[in-house]
Amino acid sequence: MTSPLLEAVALACERDWRMLFEHLELRLTGGDMVQISGPNGSGKTSLLRLLAGLMQPTSGQVLLNGQPLHAQRAELARNLLWIGHAAGIKELLSPEENLSWLCALHQPARREAIWQALAAVGLRGFEDVPCHTLSAGQQRRVALARLYLDSPPLWILDEPFTALDKQGVAQLEEHLAGHCERGGMVVLTTHHSLARMPSGYRDIDLGRWAA
C-alpha cells in the first residue's frame, strides 16, 4: 500500500463547547480528490483548517509523511497549498503584485509565470489594475491563479467555486481533476455538484463522524 502524504488519525474537533466530529480517519495519496460534505455547522471548514495545520485538533493528530504535522512547518509549505473561502488578497495591490507577494512567502515565481497564470484564469489585461476595482469573481480568480503556478502536490480548498461564472466553474473543475490525474491531491468543500471527477474521487460526509 502506498504511504499517504497526509493522514488524519482519530481526529476530533470541538468548537464553542460542542464536539463537531470525532474518531475521523483520512489518508491522502497521489490521485485522491476528497470532497468534505455535511450540513451547516458540521465542521467542514474546521476539518480543512486542521488538515492545513491552521488549527490544532481536540484530540487525534494529523501526520505529514508519517510525522506530526505541527513539527514540520517548512515541509508543510512545500507540500500544501491552502485557499480559504475568502479570496485572501490585498485589494490595494494588483493581481500581479498579489501573486508575487503570496509566492514570495514560499516559492518565488517569475513574472512571466505569474502573467501566464493570470491569463489561465481569464485575467489577461487585468494584471496591473488594483484588485479593489475587480468584481468578486475576478478577485476569486486572482486567488485561484496560484493553482496554475508551480505548486505543491496537495491543494486544500474551501468553497473554491464561490463567485465564479459557469465557464469559470467548468475550467476549475477540469484543472482540479487534471491535477489529481497527474498524481496530485485535492481536498475541498463545495455546495456545487461536481461534473468532472477523477478516478480517485470520494466523498466524506461529516454526519458519519458527528459526536
Curated annotation (Swiss-Prot):
Its EC number is 7.6.2.5. It catalyses: heme b(in) + ATP + H2O = heme b(out) + ADP + phosphate + H(+). SMART domains: AAA. It is found in: Cell inner membrane. GO terms for biological process: cytochrome complex assembly. It comes from Pseudomonas fluorescens (strain ATCC BAA-477 / NRRL B-23932 / Pf-5). This is Cytochrome c biogenesis ATP-binding export protein CcmA. Belongs to the ABC transporter superfamily. CcmA exporter (TC 3.A.1.107) family. Keywords: ATP-binding, Cell inner membrane, Cell membrane, Cytochrome c-type biogenesis, Membrane, Nucleotide-binding, Translocase, Transport. Residues 6-206 form the ABC transporter domain. One of its GO terms (cellular component) is plasma membrane. Its main location: membrane. GO terms for molecular function: ABC-type heme transporter activity; ATP binding; ATP hydrolysis activity. PROSITE patterns: ABC_TRANSPORTER_1, ABC_TRANSPORTER_2, CCMA. The complex is composed of two ATP-binding proteins (CcmA) and two transmembrane proteins (CcmB). ATP binds at residues 38-45.
